[in-house]
Amino acid sequence: MAETYTRKEFVTKYGNDIRKAVRGSGILAGTLVAQAIIESQGKATDGSYRVGQSSLSRKANNYFGIKCHSAWKGDTFNIDTGEQNPDGSTWVHQNACFRKYDSVADSIKDYVKFLKDNKRYERAGVFKAKSVKEQAEALKRGGYATANNYADTINKVYLGVKDEVLKYASPKKKAGKIILFSFAGLTLIGIGLGIYYAVRKK
């Protein structure tokens, strides 16, 4: 049986996979986490909502609702899915084809690859976004989801797990290198950030 998680448990368990996947991609860890929660969450038998509880995530390890598309050569899973028109009306896409993965980690990696491979997301400004809210709005413009409130929902979900995302999933900034050299009887210590300290030799 597939595992399910609270929102914070999900970030803790897959934080390292998320960090590796987003590093250098222009995709914010908070955006990825919030999308995974929204797309995979479902109601458990005890009435609580769990990440990984949706049929698509349980049966196909698809945590991001990514459809097959013509470029996909892997396994697939078909299921009905609800869509929303710009005017707010809804309709059901019957027997829609979704990507199927061997693991949640594979789903996380393919999410990043999917966004990078599709030029419409670059044109929409996804990879230039400086905040989760801004990136979510760009994803909506790029056609990732049809729900009119998608960007607001992503940002709200992110804020609920922000501390965990920053602790477990966000790429760590590299520390500056220590540089030592002597000049006029002083030892200059550079920390690789354009800042230097002068220390007189004893």
Where are these regions (language model features)?
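Short, Lys/Arg-enriched, disordered terminal segments
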Residues: 1-4, 200-202
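Catalytic cores of secreted/periplasmic lytic hydrolases that degrade extracellular macromolecules
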Residues: 2-174
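Single-pass alpha-helical membrane anchors
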Residues: 172-202
